[in-house]
Amino acid sequence: MANNTRSVLVVGLGRFGSSVATTLDMMGQDVLAVDKDGELVNRWSSQIPTAQADMTDVMALEQINASDFDTAVVAIGDSVEASVITAGNLLDAGISDIWAKSVSKEHARILQRIGARHIINAETDAGKRVGHLVSGNYLDYIELEGAYNVVKIHTPAHVVGYTIEDARVHERFGITVVGIKSPGKEFEYGSKELIMHRNDELIIMGKQNQIDRFLRG
């Protein structure tokens, strides 16, 4: 998606972490997935870029050049201690955009206190959804049955200043603009005469490939 590629370090290749990493990879993001478990690394190495390393070890961060990444996702669920130490190490390495999975309220509180910017609830936030949010293209993302998704995005540059009707978003891209939220204003349902402004938040619905095309223009 145009001009929005990020380098993302995913720590932990369990079910959640592997889902985040594969989603980001499919979206064209620059991903490296890391786990200390060699079997997990081998299992995923043919699908996504991987490395075997223990991120609680500062030296391991240096070996994979962790400081070069824009964003990190701490997807460690089997050890609160390892999760917190890893998040702290990544912050110390200069990665300010940290997404960290929590397994309890207490875990979430600790992660927040050390500076993790986004806390992920392990029970309610599916890995695929988090992958889309981490990519930076979506403000929110809900996957529906039947291959349809509802997403919240900022207005793409190619439709700024156009009404929904004039932009022909449904005819050109197959998506539906459900509504628009302008800064300081109430949410408005997506009537055809509404103008899409630069800082508006759009709620749109469509299949993933249709949404991707709309974002790219």
Please place each PLM-identified region on the residue numbering.
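Cytosolic regulatory regions of ion transport systems
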Residues: M1-G217
